[in-house]
């Protein structure tokens, strides 16, 4: 019995004194993934830009404006109002969403009258930036690249992944933050 206990202690001592063998780290090369992702996004942006130029060329009677935010727009009806929405203003607007072939995805009747408090509510980036350049009474058509609207996910309903969209927006009313309603 004593011999078994002593041999067990000796074996435990021997095993505990061994140095752990270091493992080599697994090398993950993320650069190849990143390079592939960058080239895919560049190709997507080029295709979207080409499609926008084709739409603009077909609509030669309209004057499209390139925004610093990365989308194109034209005025269908331009208001004489000079005030543009500021932080905290409440906007009332309607909009249609179309694909690049001018087929309606969501109509203004489906989406109804919308309210948005500027920079205090969630809204797709393109529409958020587009509303900020409008005046009360304006009717504007926006050409949004996919990364300015629903991007890689789509809306999980009618809008597909990486789908560029046309928004036709009517800004009905701007309730200024400082005005008492």
Language-model-detected regions and their locations in the chain:
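Sec-dependent bacterial lipoprotein signal peptides
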Residues: 1-17
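Cross-family detector of peptidyl-prolyl cis-trans isomerase
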Residues: 17-181
